[in-house]
Amino acid sequence: LIFIINYAITFSKIFSKSRELIAEGFADNYIYTFDRDKCKIFQHATQSVSIMKCFNKNSFSKNGIYTSRMFRESPSIYEIKVSNCNKYLFPKKSSYYESHRLPKIGENINKVILDKLLFYNNHVVSILSKSGGKIWIRTSGNYWYNAFDKKPYNSTEISPLFVEKDFIDFLTVLMNSSLFYFWLRIYGDGRHMNKD
């Protein structure tokens, strides 16, 4: 079976049950994800899309779901790389039976970086607080997400984030890094910042 579907199949927790049924119903599943803006074959789409291919229904073999990275520009369809997502569901150590996000991995180097990030048990969310120091974050940024020490401008996409005072500078630098952007591209929708 081959489908062209909304790219939310990868990042939305609402589709966790759908991904479970896909992983359990077929031997091999491939999801390629494309941005609507610069991928020529989808340039008139109103949302970014994924191509999902499912093979060998009701097979005893269950290899899970393989994903590409999210393509910003049209790739050669014959050279798309995929990686198995089974051990990279988010939150860490989730299964398809639980509420999760599916990563858009693609090339092996992305898997290597994820392995290093997921090796550690510390979570950035542990330094967030309901009071303390405040930074400002831009929660929507098609190509970048930013953190600021002062509110840069008025927008519905600029929000305060409270952080333990000792970690304000650290979190500001982290959220302005390409590593943070990498994480959001892997697990997010490519436009809005995940809060988990």
Language model regions located:
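Short amphipathic beta-strand starts and helix->beta connectors
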Residues: 142-146, 184-187
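Structured loops at beta-to-helix junctions and adjacent beta-edge loops in soluble globular domains
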Residues: 54-57, 70, 138-140, 162-164, ...
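Short, glycine-/Ser/Thr-/acidic-enriched flexible segments
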Residues: 8, 59, 140-144, 150-151, ...
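Generic structural signal for small/hydrophobic residues in well-ordered secondary structure
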Residues: 134-137, 171
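Basic, amphipathic alpha-helical recognition segments used for DNA target recognition
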Residues: 161-196
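Generic recognition of long tandem-repeat/solenoid scaffolds
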Residues: 137-138, 193
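Signature of N6-adenine DNA methyltransferases within the class I
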Residues: 1-130, 148-158, 193-195
